[in-house]
């Protein structure tokens, strides 16, 4: 034995990827795009969904499916989630200055939601943007991330509602415990990408 420490390639690669994502966050390489939500009858824009992309200096614009799974269970996902919240609220504040007031939804994973200080930190972030009225920011909880201890999650969602934040379940119908979530979590909206009857994708 030479005493040189090595590690399995997949583990090394994952660590390197996570380090690069952290560097990207520090360098402001992430951007938000806003997908409009339109009333089909009136054609009016009634909201927007904030979609994160990574403006990588070598790889170009990287889709979230290519980097978010790498940090789904890593504390870095909490940092990125807070960046998304701050960026979306800052954009909403700018739109409001221009006379545009529309609700915006952002995705949040279960690790972020289950942080013990989540509500406290959310309240602190909201306080930085006092011009945004209650009910204008929505948290789309990604159901495919493991939601543990539904009682605590339910209490957190209730606390968010007290702050004027709407909560919804994203990807509803993709997990084995979907109906349990529906019964036990006080969310205000369900966002389903699957049909219960046919199993066909909506998007």
Language-model features: locations:
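Short, small-residue-biased leader/transition segments that mark boundaries at the very start
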Residues: 2-9
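Signal-transducing alpha-helical linker
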Residues: 12-16, 20, 26, 72, ...
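Active-site core of bacterial EAL-family cyclic-dinucleotide phosphodiesterase domains
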Residues: 13-70, 107, 169
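Anion (oxyanion) recognition and catalysis
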Residues: 26, 96, 161
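Residue-level detector of anion-binding/catalytic polar loops
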Residues: 31, 101, 166
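Catalytic core of bacterial c-di-GMP phosphodiesterases, primarily the EAL and HD-GYP domains
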Residues: 42-49, 75-152
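The catalytic core of metal-dependent phosphodiesterases that act on cyclic dinucleotides
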Residues: 125-200
């Amino acid at each position: 034995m030479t005493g040189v420490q090595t590690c399995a390639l997949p583990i090394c690669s994952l660590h390197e990827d996570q380090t690069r994502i952290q560097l990207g966050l520090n360098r402001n390489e992430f951007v938000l795009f806003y997908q409009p939500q339109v009333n089909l009858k009136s054609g009016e824009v009634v909201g927007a969904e904030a979609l994160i992309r990574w403006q990588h200096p070598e790889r170009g614009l990287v889709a979230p499916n290519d980097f978010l799974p790498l940090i789904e269970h890593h504390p870095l996902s909490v940092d990125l989630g807070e960046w998304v919240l701050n960026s979306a609220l800052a954009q909403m504040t700018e739109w409001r200055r221009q006379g545009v007031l529309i609700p915006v939804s952002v995705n949040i994973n279960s690790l972020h939601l289950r942080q013990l200080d989540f509500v406290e930190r959310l309240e602190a972030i909201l306080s930085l943007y006092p011009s945004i009225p209650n009910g204008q920011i929505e948290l789309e909880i990604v159901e495919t991330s493991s939601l543990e201890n539904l009682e605590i999650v339910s209490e957190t969602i209730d606390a968010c509602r007290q702050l004027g934040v709407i909560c919804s379940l994203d990807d509803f119908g993709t997990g084995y415990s979907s109906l349990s979530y529906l019964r036990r979590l006080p969310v205000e909206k369900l966002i389903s990408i699957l049909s219960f009857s046919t199993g066909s994708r909506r998007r």
